[in-house]
């Protein structure tokens, strides 16, 4: 894990210890080599689907997909992309709940590689440390940018924040539409999946839990 930030190392280790890391096998393939190999195989796949890759609308599609996978929608598989985190001492002695809601979640279902689209809400009770508000959004985005299962993603965000804040008092909920349900299979266009992960006082204290959930309405 050389070259990773201290925050990235701590979060990765915490997830591995809890069995919550996304299933991955490390390799030494560079970003550019990954894109070259993905582009090559994507040409084969699209050719097997009888698409004419000499057409000017399609000829760059394998390259676009490879770049999108490595640099964008699956960039969260690489911990060198973990956001730079600002955590400061709670010198103001803030003790009330901090809640960020309506955080955009755009991820990819790891079963069919189609879109998961939704919103997240994150809350924590400040103890010794406070995290920059935009960092919460960036952490959500980091874990969304990989093939995912919503249940695991919710837990990953929880553990990442608990680790960085050095506090169990964190809550996360995600409401999302899964296009593996909406656009294929059962083709249910209206259903939504909700997952919640609660830690510390959010799990042990019904009043705190209710305050968090009530604030999402």
Curated annotation (Swiss-Prot):
This protein's UniProt keywords: GTP-binding, Hydrolase, Metal-binding, Nucleotide-binding, One-carbon metabolism, Zinc
Molecular function (Gene Ontology), one example: zinc ion binding
Entry EC number(s): 3.5.4.16
Residues the record lists as binding Zn(2+): 109, 112, 180
Matches recorded under PROSITE patterns: GTP_CYCLOHYDROL_1_1 (PS00859), GTP_CYCLOHYDROL_1_2 (PS00860)
Gene Ontology cellular-component terms listed: cytoplasm
Any GO BP annotation: one-carbon metabolic process
Pathway given in the UniProt record: Cofactor biosynthesis; 7,8-dihydroneopterin triphosphate biosynthesis; 7,8-dihydroneopterin triphosphate from GTP: step 1/1
InterPro entries for this protein: GTP-CH-I_C/QueF (IPR043133), GTP-CH-I_N (IPR043134), GTP_CycHdrlase_I (IPR001474), GTP_CycHdrlase_I_CS (IPR018234), GTP_CycHdrlase_I_dom (IPR020602)
Pfam family, one: GTP_cyclohydroI
Reaction equation(s) it catalyzes: GTP + H2O = 7,8-dihydroneopterin 3'-triphosphate + formate + H(+)
Recorded family membership: Belongs to the GTP cyclohydrolase I family.
PANTHER family reported in the protein's UniProt record: GTP CYCLOHYDROLASE 1, GTP CYCLOHYDROLASE I
Subunit structure: Toroid-shaped homodecamer, composed of two pentamers of five dimers.
Stated name of the protein: GTP cyclohydrolase 1
Annotated organism of origin: Vibrio campbellii (strain ATCC BAA-1116)
Gene for this chain: folE
């Amino acid at each position: 894990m050389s070259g990773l930030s201290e925050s990235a190392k701590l979060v990765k280790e915490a997830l591995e210890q809890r069995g919550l890391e996304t299933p991955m096998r490390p390799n030494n393939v560079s970003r550019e080599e990954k894109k070259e190999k993905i582009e090559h195989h994507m040409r084969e796949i699209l050719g097997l689907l009888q698409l004419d890759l000499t057409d000017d609308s399609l000829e760059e599609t394998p390259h676009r997909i490879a770049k999108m996978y490595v640099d964008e929608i699956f960039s969260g598989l690489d911990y060198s992309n973990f956001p730079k985190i600002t955590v400061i001492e709670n010198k103001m002695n803030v003790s009330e709940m901090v809640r960020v809601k309506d955080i955009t979640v755009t991820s990819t279902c790891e079963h069919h590689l189609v879109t998961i689209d939704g919103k997240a809400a994150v809350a924590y009770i400040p103890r010794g440390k406070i995290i920059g508000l935009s960092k919460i959004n960036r952490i959500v985005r980091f874990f969304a940018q990989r093939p995912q299962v919503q249940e695991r993603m919710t837990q990953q965000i929880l553990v990442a924040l608990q680790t960085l804040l050095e506090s169990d008092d964190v809550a996360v909920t995600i409401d999302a539409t899964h296009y593996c349900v909406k656009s294929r299979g059962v083709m249910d266009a209206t259903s939504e999946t909700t997952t919640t992960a609660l830690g510390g006082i959010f799990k042990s204290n019904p009043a705190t839990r209710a305050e968090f959930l009530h604030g999402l309405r």
